[in-house]
A protein has these predicted regions:
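Short glycine/acidic-rich loop motifs that flank beta-strands on beta-rich extracellular proteins
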Residues: 100-103, 122-127, 158-166, 187-194, ...
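N-terminal extracellular ligand-recognition/capping segment immediately after the signal peptide
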Residues: 84-128, 154, 183
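Extracellular fibronectin type III
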Residues: 674-692, 847-857
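Conserved aromatic anchor
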Residues: 614-625, 786-795
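Beta-strand-rich modules
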Residues: 656-675, 834, 838-847
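Acidic Gly/Asp/Thr-rich repetitive segments characteristic of extracellular carbohydrate-active
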Residues: 55-92
Length: 857
């Protein structure tokens, strides 16, 4: 393969890939890919035996009067030489109160078990109560392993001179299990601080008691990145936590419950299950997760918290929460991954205003685009792929807030506004600069602002929600947000408008039911889009309103019992309407004011028929909402201009008379609507070019005057002449025969075709054919004629008459001699010879009660 060929193929492949990527970007987000986590937590098993030691045996004072830290540490040290992957060391702390004056260190394969009623009390001002020993100094997850802490109480017991501390700290290890433990009383730190641990289970524990103002989590999941983030745990290698199960715990009387308030850029916490926990009386956030992915947060109860769940891939103050990787920023964008793959479901949440959250919200998903950042690479740190489903949320502020995210699904939640508490003017569901977000099948009740607010972004869907009593609008779309769909929602008793599209936003609004809004059912004000198949009833002003909106379509909506108009347009609005229905609107069906315009559809299927020399008829399809139609005409001259020639208010056709033959005219039709103050015109139909014809009336023919009766249809070949021109059959005209079988007068109608119109009628006779029973031979010498022949069974008799010589059409000068007996032709002969000179003769017979004559001979 040549270099040129390889280059061409590579370029073509690159172009194809670009097209595919652009195409994929047009599709809706595939929510089926959001599966959450399969986290299993700590996996501690496989021991063949266990050794048990008791701290009292090492001199621990269970009355708490003496320092027991040395005794307890000796018991823990027993695991150094005696514990292994096959032998677990169980260190038992009996019921009692144990004072420790310095921190404790725990080693691999240790089960530290506190019996019911056992409490370890911290009695020093600096540092944690217990940490893993870091015996080998390894990084990653390679230090301690298989540590269990179970039962009892760990009391941080801060004093007035205490420095910030964590009750427990664990890092660079694998498999940590904390269960059925009460951990209480911390000052400006964490109850449990975990960094760089893989395999974590924390269950059935009780976390409470906190002093200080720092917003720190009771359980902190962290990366080991530097001495500021996780001091005393070298090496600093950015190891994150992975595979954590935190379930069935209690968190109360704290600022924050659990999570991560910092992260290393490009490093993610993965596989976290937070389930069945209860959080209550928390002035801050129950769960804060920065840079987490593959999470499930389910079946938790969160009561009286300032914020329930805060999920972020960037923060407002990025330099405070995100730090530089130890490997630096080289190749950092290859390590960034915005797919969160997280599920938040079946949680029961009540949020209230607090010191830290004066404007509370239940759930936040937050991303941020950095441009010209002084601390981190410029990048859109967005969040994708989160489901928020089946939650019960009661809020004194907002329920769900989304910033710079995409692929978020908010479905089947029961969200209500708490009017019984001090509350705040916020939107229930708030979207900012977010795209491909679906808000569906939620029950949204109350709020002082909007039930669903969208600003910026594109491709969002708000569908099949039940929305009641929003303070402002049920759905409010603003800030240039594009390609939004609002469908199938039921909105009642909005404090302002049911649905509002404004500030250059665009939306397709369809199949919604909006009732009893204080103002309009649906309003476009400075926005654009289409409203179709909506039901708008009993609203305080109009059902549909276009206010200074340049491009709006109202199709097939039902506007009933509104206190204003069915449809209203004002200022510079341009509104296309079709198929709308109206009933019992107090002020009327359609009202247009200012420089607004209601634009009807252009008439379709404009056709011409009955085209003739001086007239023609136009027909077209009916235009919905039209009160009538204007018809315009011009000639095809280059400088000709359309002139209105008719206003049709009855039907969809018009006949134009007084036209000039063989002249081309151009027509167009436009629907109009008679609103309250003025006539509104629709769009023009397509131009229809038509040429008038010549009339065939007055034409002549060379048709024969008679033809013989044969019992079959008689037709002729003849020419038709108009103005000296010979017409071409089946091009310029066609013929239609009638009465052209039986004896009598046949009719021929010549009908114009092509450039000819109208018709002309002609006639010819059909007569019985002569029987040739008589032959008349005039003889000039004796002025007599000889009549001879044979009788015929067809004739019943004969007429013989004197004829005017040399004339085809004879005139009878005397009564003819009638011979009734056709079997005796000799009588005819004799009579003729005796009485007549020049004769003519014809046969006759009775046929269906009428005398039918043959041709004269």
């Amino acid at each position: 393969m040549t270099k040129i060929t390889r280059t061409f193929i590579a370029s073509a492949a690159a172009c194809l890939l670009a097209i595919l990527l652009m195409t994929v970007g047009c599709f809706a987000y595939d929510y089926s890919t959001i599966t959450g986590t399969k986290a299993s937590g700590a996996e501690i098993s496989g021991y063949s035996g266990a050794l048990e030691v008791n701290v009292v045996d090492f001199g621990a004072d269970k009355k708490g009067k003496k320092d027991s830290s040395k005794a307890i540490q000796k018991a823990l040290d027993y695991a150094i030489d005696n514990g292994s992957n096959s032998v677990q060391i169980k260190v038992v702390v009996p019921k009692g109160k144990y004072r420790i004056d310095r921190l404790l260190e725990i080693y691999s394969n240790t089960w530290l078990y506190l019996e019911d009623g056992a409490t370890i009390v911290r009695n020093f001002d600096k540092g944690c109560m217990i940490k893993n020993a870091q015996a080998n100094g390894a990084g990653g997850y390679g230090s301690e392993r298989n540590i269990v802490i179970e039962g009892g109480c760990w009391d941080g017991n801060p004093s007035s001179t205490s420095r910030p501390f964590s009750n427990m700290r664990f890092g660079h290890m694998k498999n940590l299990w904390i269960k059925n433990v009460e951990i209480k009383n911390n000052y400006n730190g964490h109850h449990v601080e975990i960094g760089g641990v893989k395999g974590i289970t924390i269950e059935d524990c009780d976390f409470h008691g906190y002093t200080g103002t720092s917003q720190k989590e009771a359980i902190q999941l962290d990366t080991i990145s530097n001495s500021d983030v996780f001091p005393a745990y070298e090496p600093f290698d950015d190891t994150p936590c992975d595979n954590a199960v935190i379930k069935n715990n209690k968190f109360h009387d704290l600022i924050r419950g659990l999570g991560s308030h910092s992260a290393c850029l490009g490093v993610y916490y993965t596989n976290t299950l937070i389930s069945g926990n209860s959080f209550y009386n928390m002035s801050g956030t129950a769960i804060v997760l920065i840079n987490h992915k593959k999470c499930i947060i389910e079946n938790n109860t969160m009561k009286n918290v300032g914020c329930a769940i805060d999920f972020k891939y960037m923060t407002d103050y990025e330099n405070a929460n995100f730090h530089v990787p130890n490997s630096g920023y080289a190749g950092i964008k290859d390590r960034l991954d915005d797919n969160a793959n997280t599920i938040i479901r079946n949680n029961d949440i009540t949020v209230v205003g607090t010191y830290y959250y004066p404007e509370p919200y239940a759930i936040q998903i937050f991303g941020k685009k950095l441009e010209k950042s002084y601390s981190h690479p410029d990048y859109n740190y967005t969040v994708k792929g989160v489901k928020i489903v089946d939650n019960i949320i009661k809020t004194a502020g907002s329920a769900v807030r989304l910033t710079d995210v995409s692929g978020i699904f908010i479905g089947s939640n029961d969200i209500s506004y708490d009017y019984d508490r001090y509350n705040y003017s916020m939107d229930l569901i708030w979207l900012s600069e977010s795209s491909q977000v679906t808000v569906t099948k939620n029950k949204l009740t109350g709020t002082k602002q909007n039930s669903v607010y969208i600003s910026g972004g594109s491709g969002n869907e708000v569908s099949s929600n039940t929305i009641k009593k929003p303070g402002v609008s049920g759905v409010y779309v603003s800030g240039g947000s594009d390609k939004n769909t609002i469908s199938g929602n039921t909105i009642t008793s909005a404090g302002s408008n049911g649905i509002k599209i404004t500030k250059e936003a665009k939306a397709d609004v369809r199949k919604n039911t909006v009732k009893k809004s204080k103002n309009h059912g649906l309003i476009f004000t400075g926005g654009s889009g289409k409203a179709s198949d909506n039901i708008l009833e009993e609203n305080g002003l109009s059902g549909l309103m276009a206010d200074n909106s340049a491009s709006v379509e109202f199709f097939n909506n039902s506007c009933n019992k509104n206190k204003g108009y069915g449809i209203k347009a004002n200022k510079k609005s341009q509104v296309k309407i079709s198929g709308n229905s109206f009933a019992d609107n107090s002020k009327g069906d359609i009202y247009v004011t200012g420089s607004a315009a209601v634009l009807l559809n252009a008439p379709d299927n404009v056709k011409s028929q009955d085209i003739c020399s001086d007239k023609l008829t136009l027909t077209w399809d009916e235009v919905s909402q039209a009160d009538g139609y204007y018809v315009y005409r011009k000639t095809d001259a280059e400088d000709a201009e359309f002139e209105q020639i008719a206003a049709v208010t009855d039907g969809t056709s018009f006949t134009d008379y007084g036209l000039v033959p063989k002249t081309r005219y151009v027509y167009k039709v436009k629907a109009f609507l008679d609103t309250v103050d003025k006539i509104q015109e629709g769009s023009d139909s397509a131009d229809m070019s038509i040429k008038t014809k010549l009339t065939i009336v007055g034409c002549t023919t060379n048709m024969r005057g008679s033809m013989s009766y044969t019992g079959k249809e008689r037709t002729q070949i003849f020419d038709v002449f108009v103005g000296g021109e010979t017409l071409i059959p089946d091009v310029d005209y066609r013929t239609v025969y009638s009465d052209n079988v039986n004896v009598g007068t046949a009719k021929v109608t010549v009908i114009g075709m092509g450039q000819y119109c109208d018709s002309a009628d002609f006639q010819f006779d059909i007569t019985l054919k002569s029987d040739n029973v008589m032959v008349i031979k005039p003889q000039e010498l004796n002025r007599k004629s000889i009549v001879s022949g044979k009788p015929t069974m067809k004739a019943q008799g004969y007429e013989v008459a004197e004829a005017v010589k040399d004339k085809l059409d004879h005139t009878t000068h005397s009564e003819p001699a009638i011979v009734v007996n056709y079997n005796s032709p000799s009588q005819v002969i004799a009579k003729a010879r005796a009485d007549m000179l020049d004769l003519r003769v014809r046969s006759y017979r009775e046929l269906t009660g009428e005398t039918i004559y043959g041709a004269w001979l």
